[in-house]
Amino acid sequence: MTKNEKKSLNQSLAEWKLFIYNPTTGEFLGRTAKSWGLILLFYLVFYGFLAALFSFTMWVMLQTLNDEVPKYRDQIPSPGLMVFPKPVTALEYTFSRSDPTSYAGYIEDLKKFLKPYTLEEQKNLTVCPDGALFEQKGPVYVACQFPISLLQACSGMNDPDFGYSQGNPCILVKMNRIIGLKPEGVPRIDCVSKNEDIPNVAVYPHNGMIDLKYFPYYGKKLHVGYLQPLVAVQVSFAPNNTGKEVTVECKIDGSANLKSQDDRDKFLGRVMFKITARA
């Protein structure tokens, strides 16, 4: 058969059948059983070796890690600040005192966040001495109680609406946890209004003080039940300020090793949020 002649359909099918299985040589897809066995054995050994090498490498790496304390912590020398309730958009709170549905989500978020701080939830925690670092050697680490009454009007104990129904909303501020952090001096969270005509910003506890007894923190697995100290900010809107946007800035102060100013991170140790209360 010349190159220009086309194979018939039967010839093509016969060649394909012969390629798939050749009864004369016993080949399957062009290879004998021995050839297929050697190939499968090679890939089994090859990929088995790769899997074993990967597993061994991971095991060696995991031996260098501590399951309770992160190995590298020097990249986070100073904590940032977070606010609650969680704002719907960016760091802006907007509500109407006459419309409970506008702030119902804020109240629910605050109640959920403060649940671990209730007296019932803290009954198994330790009453720690005030004014000094509470250093522990382990292996058992206890957590200090944080009296929710320190938040006063923003504790939710006497006002389940956290001031929103009266136009005096509460915002909770806390520092991020850093394992082993030992603040110096008398740390506090200072919160002020950036609006000169709205000076009435109350901070609880008094002056936003943070007791040293809540430091150091030993990690989630070791320091079971640990409660972060909180600071509450309450902005009081006068009737003539209804509908006006108020900007509040909170920053860490009073401690030499806790930064609130950094050229590379303008949010280090500080947070700024906006509140708009409508009638």
Swiss-Prot record:
Region of interest: immunoglobulin-like: 186-279
Disulfide bridge positions per record: C128-C144, C154-C170, C191-C250
Coiled-coil blocks: none
Keyword field contains Transmembrane helix: yes
Topology, Extracellular side: 57-279
Gene3D superfamilies attached to this UniProt entry: Na, k-atpase alpha subunit
Localisation: Apical cell membrane; Basolateral cell membrane; Melanosome
Major localization class: membrane
Keyword Transport: yes
Membrane topology of the entry: Single-pass type II membrane protein
Keywords from the named record: Cell membrane, Disulfide bond, Glycoprotein, Ion transport, Membrane, Potassium, Potassium transport, Signal-anchor, Sodium, Sodium transport, Sodium/potassium transport, Transmembrane, Transmembrane helix, Transport
Pfam families, sorted: Na_K-ATPase
UniProt GO cellular component terms: apical plasma membrane; basolateral plasma membrane; extracellular exosome; melanosome; plasma membrane; sodium:potassium-exchanging ATPase complex; sperm flagellum
Domain of life: Eukaryota
Cytoplasmic side: 1-35
Residues of this chain annotated as glycosylated in UniProt: N124, N240
Transmembrane domains' residue ranges: 36-56
GO molecular function, a single term: transporter activator activity
GO biological process: intracellular potassium ion homeostasis; intracellular sodium ion homeostasis; membrane repolarization; positive regulation of potassium ion import across plasma membrane; positive regulation of sodium ion export across plasma membrane; potassium ion import across plasma membrane; potassium ion transmembrane transport; protein localization to plasma membrane
Family: Belongs to the X(+)/potassium ATPases subunit beta family.
Function of the protein: This is the non-catalytic component of the active enzyme, which catalyzes the hydrolysis of ATP coupled with the exchange of Na(+) and K(+) ions across the plasma membrane. The exact function of the beta-3 subunit is not known.
Subunit structure comment from the entry: The sodium/potassium-transporting ATPase is composed of a catalytic alpha subunit, an auxiliary non-catalytic beta subunit and an additional regulatory subunit. Interacts with catalytic alpha subunit ATP12A.
Domains: entry comment: The C-terminal lobe folds into an immunoglobulin-like domain and may mediate cell adhesion properties.
UniProt cross-references to PANTHER family, sorted A to Z: SODIUM/POTASSIUM-DEPENDENT ATPASE BETA SUBUNIT, SODIUM_POTASSIUM-TRANSPORTING ATPASE SUBUNIT BETA-3
Protein name (record): Sodium/potassium-transporting ATPase subunit beta-3
Organism: Homo sapiens (Human)
